[in-house]
Amino acid sequence: MKPARLFSKCVNGTYTHTENSGDFFTERLGNTLYIYLECSHGGDDWQNNLDFPARPYRHGKSASWFAHRGFVRVWRSVEPYLEKEVADPTVRRIVTVGYSHGAALAVLCHEYVWNARPDLRERIEGYGFGCPRVFWGPRFPWLTRRWARFAVIRNKDDIVTHVPPAALGFSHVGKMIEIGEKGRYSPIDAHRPENILKELERGEE
């Protein structure tokens, strides 16, 4: 499925709502599981978005790392709802997709899948459209390889992809893919879903 189609599904999906405004839906196509995570849609989301001091985080017995505290709180609310589907042995490929606030959750979801399904590490993919920074601290190769197949999609000038500030120790993980042209949109308009979709479709022509 091409990025424009994934993004459209993410923006227009019907979501299951959990505690702390962590919203998701899943789709099974053949042996592929798609996990979609929703953007901000209320005051609780913004409280979590702005709660950005870093905190230790880890899945199970894996080595811990530091992440945006608010996003970790929301992800912990979503994780139990996905455990059964992720563990299903008939699932042979997993794709995580998120936009904005949901893209930050997709970063955490992707790492969760990497740990929960070591048999699928070469068959997991992730897409964070308009993704904020989630990771904090030194970028050790043994740690960042967890996101080797995760793509941060940035519409150039998108302000959300530049927060929290790198000066505070935050950084993106995975591969950065830039779309659009610098100066085409204001920093806020570059984050709007209709403009991201327009640039994705333009790139697929």
Task: Give the residues covered by each predicted segment.
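Non-catalytic, mobile gating and regulatory segments of ester bond hydrolases
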Residues: 1-97, 101-205
